[in-house]
């Protein structure tokens, strides 16, 4: 969702009020995500802070400005093959099945300036004498702009350096 936001003109520095947001789901019913984060309630926080702190309210705010169908489309563009993804407002919190390989492949777009590199398990085949019988190159596809990729790198670093991912540094 944050990548979709960056692709649609949002910036990591954009400020959002840290309050509960209620969206209308695909059945016309109100949907309000719960939030474990009790910091800065009512204050203005940045989009980057929202991702760094895994904040469901900021995520819901972004979904209110975007579209679950566009999010589903972007998820597939990033190489996720699951066709059972439901384009609902709750998709912003990530309730869909994605394999580790798909996740790794999707995340390659950020350090590669928006180009996703598909997993490649065999790079070449040789015979017993070392002669190369076949070579294989990874499939690459531009999935987001260079600008969005850079903004996502900034925000993902904040997850580890300032937010909920800090445990991986210890």
Describe these PLM feature segments.
Residues 11-12, 49, 53, 99-105, ...:
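A penicillin-recognizing enzyme superfamily signal
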Residues 1-44, 118-131:
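Short, glycine/proline-biased beta-turn/loop segments that scaffold the active-site neighborhood
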Residues 28, 86-89, 135-138:
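Short acidic, glycine/proline-rich loop/turn micro-motifs
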Residues 30-31, 77-79, 135-136:
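Short, charged/polar low-complexity linear motifs in solvent-exposed/disordered segments
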Residues 16-21, 34-112, 157-158:
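Active-site-adjacent helix/loop patches that line small-molecule binding or acyl-intermediate pockets
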């Amino acid at each position: 969702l944050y990548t979709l936001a960056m692709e649609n003109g949002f910036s990591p520095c954009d400020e959002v009020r840290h309050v509960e947001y209620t969206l209308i789901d695909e059945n016309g019913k109100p949907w309000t995500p719960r939030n474990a984060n009790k910091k800065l309630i009512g204050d203005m926080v940045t989009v980057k802070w929202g991702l760094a702190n895994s904040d469901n309210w900021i995520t819901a705010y972004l979904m209110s400005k975007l579209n679950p169908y566009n999010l589903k489309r972007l998820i597939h563009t990033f190489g996720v093959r699951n066709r059972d993804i439901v384009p609902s407002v709750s998709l912003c919190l990530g309730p869909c099945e994605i394999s580790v390989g798909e996740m790794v492949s999707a995340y390659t777009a950020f350090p590669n300036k928006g180009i996703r590199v598909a997993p490649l398990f065999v790079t070449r085949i040789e015979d017993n004498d070392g002669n190369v019988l076949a070579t294989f190159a990874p499939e690459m596809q531009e999935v987001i702009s260079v600008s969005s990729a850079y903004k996502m790198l900034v925000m993902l670093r904040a997850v580890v350096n300032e937010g909920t991912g800090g445990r991986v540094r210890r």
